[in-house]
Amino acid sequence: MDQFLLDELAASVAKRPAYWDRDFSSHEAYVKSVEPNRKRLAHILGLRDARTVFDGLQLDGTTATSSLVGQTDRITIHAVSWPAFRDVTGTGLLLEPRGRDVVANVVAIPDSGQIPEQIAGLSLGLTPELQYARRLAESGCRVVVPMLIDRQEKITRLTRREFLYRSAFELGRQLVGYEIQKTLAVVDWYKKSWPAKPVGVIGWGEGGLITQYAAAVDTRIDAACVSGYFDSRQNIWQEPIDRNVFGLLEQFGDAELVSLIAPRPFIVDAARGPEATIPGGRGAPSRVVTPALGSVKEELARAERLIEKLEPRAKLRLVEGGQKPLTGQALGQFLKSLAADTALGQAGENNITHLRKKFDAAPRHAAQFHEIDRHTQWLLRESPFVRKQFYKPDTSSVAKFEASNEKYRTQFYDDVIGRFDRKRLPLNARSRKIYDTEKWVGHEVVLDVFPNVIAYGILLLPRDLKADEKRPVVVCQHGLEGRPQDIIQDDHRAYHDFAAKLAERGFITFSPQNLYIFTDRFRTLQRKANPLKKTLFSVIIPQHQQIVDWLKTLSYVDKERIAFYGLSYGGKTAMRVPPVVTDYCLSICSADFNEWVDKNASTRNPHSYVNSGEYEIFEWDLGSTFNYAEMAGLIAPRPFMVERGHYDGVASDETVGWEFAKVRFLYQGKLKLKDRCEIEWFDGPHTINGKGTYDFLHRHLNWPKR
């Protein structure tokens, strides 16, 4: 499986041209021709919130402190903030030249491990030659330096960036998208106030990431310079998870982003970048490394090949030969791309004195952190209304409902789960007997699915199965870190051998092995899949389709009576596989059904995943599309059941009831299906109860009780 995804990642580069239709007849035609790709990039970056229009930056001072935090005979530096979107602001510094005209307007973005004061010369950490915001201001530029959220750990062993990324991702937003919006809000102000003045964006490390994306999505930016970041993105799954962009590599690597910036000047400073190792804990293990020079050159050469037909040629520049980021050569080229007649001034010798003697950056960072969290939580509260506008099947009749539901099924598979565009392999079934009991016989089964991908499970056949008899099948699914064997023997506290007990009742059962096993090993699969616009279920669904197709070839299986029953992560499977594998005639979700979007995005809900170690669990933009009620809608009109223990820590009873009420209303209120949707509440924990669900199976699979 790992090799399959690595192969898909490698193949993604060659598949990208299919998404582009570049017109090289003129610069204007070219820019217009790549606009659909630009819009797609903005969408996957989560740039959906309307930015606030404003007339000027706010000078951040009080009766006790001035907004003026530093000045020399060449520049002034003010603490500033500005509206970005809704109630979210940007904050940082404004540097302006003294005694001369402004030649260009610039946004200079530090790495997330830096504070604005460092690149402005107000704080320790950088020598004057590396204080690129200061040097640009001293050379005649007006410069705004925004603050980024840092990557320090919270007390929960989770970085601040990952914490904010998690809930935003579930709601179709990105932390990097929020920071791009803050940058573009400054660009809005620049263009509104000085429409004829050139605008440039420059950044190092994480600031380079924001620079590159901002320049790619906004053509008003006249030039961009990226230092310590530009590289092949094929190993993005090893980078911090807050850089994870769902579907990025489907259309975009860094070379393709450059092709969106073209024909505008783009400078790559192949200098040392930030370096860090994030061990994980509750968060995703990752690393930040300096891009290798060879890789940088190769990716830039690929960009040049993508736009080689563009005339006049795009102005791409590579600066190499130095480890120090954004020093003379790179900074000089960036300045000349904005103001050709302006030379970069010499670096000063000393830092600038900070006029706030007891300056502490921590309160500013905390305020920005909580603003972003509050905005995302507001999106969460609004999301039920967004989904209600999104999911509108025709419920005037069951037939019309089924027909109108197909477009949502397609969207769910293509845009939420992610569909691999490849044919499944022939079944090539292999089996061996591994159980021989008084009431049933068990066989291990292996099926081919894709290259380097198999489906594996255990088939249990009741001993009283007669020749020429066709019986119903229940596909029984284990949970997180589980095995098929766990639901067959040894009376596991959660499973209680439910696959074996159903076989004792006369059902044929099949217990597949799903991918969610071996902790970071399977979570890394999700990380490799996401940039391809795929998920773990992009593989699990074809595996289940192959299983169902194989079951249908067995002479003793009734093709119309194949049911699904899963617990915990298997219940998560019950909500995602039957909507797509419609061969399943019913679905039972045990110990998982809840208000899933809230569980993934809430920073208040005590049951939330936001502070958990399950960093793979978050799914792109479910908040705007499919919560569990909508997923159940894709199962309808087939029978659907929830098994819920009062003391199951997955969620509270009231949360489960809230979401289930929507499903019940669809089945019984709108579609008038009185007997196909139910929930069993029982006095117990996270476990198979095996009472109401067994009755449900007997009734809907038309199999007598024993």
Language-model-derived ranges and their functions:
Residues M1-G90, G172, Y178, L184, ...:
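Alpha/beta-hydrolase-fold serine-hydrolase catalytic core, especially in secreted/extracellular enzymes
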Residues L95, I109-P110, P146, I202-Q212, ...:
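Generic beta-strand/beta-sheet core signal
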Residues D101-S193, P198, W204, Y229-R243, ...:
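Cap/lid segment of the alpha/beta-hydrolase catalytic domain
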Residues V103-A104, S139-R142, A196-P198, T219-A223, ...:
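Loop/turn elements at helix/coil->beta-strand transitions in domains of secreted/extracellular proteins
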Residues I119-T127, F163-Q181, V201-I202, Q212, ...:
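Alpha-helix capping and helix-loop boundary segments enriched in small/acidic/polar residues
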Residues R134, Q212-Y213, S259, A399, ...:
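Alpha-helical segments flanking ligand/cofactor-binding loops in enzyme cores
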Residues D150-R151, E275, Y516-I517, Y565, ...:
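Conserved beta-strand edge residues that scaffold enzyme active sites
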Residues V186-L260, D549-L622:
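Primarily recognizes the serine-hydrolase "nucleophile elbow" in alpha/beta-hydrolase
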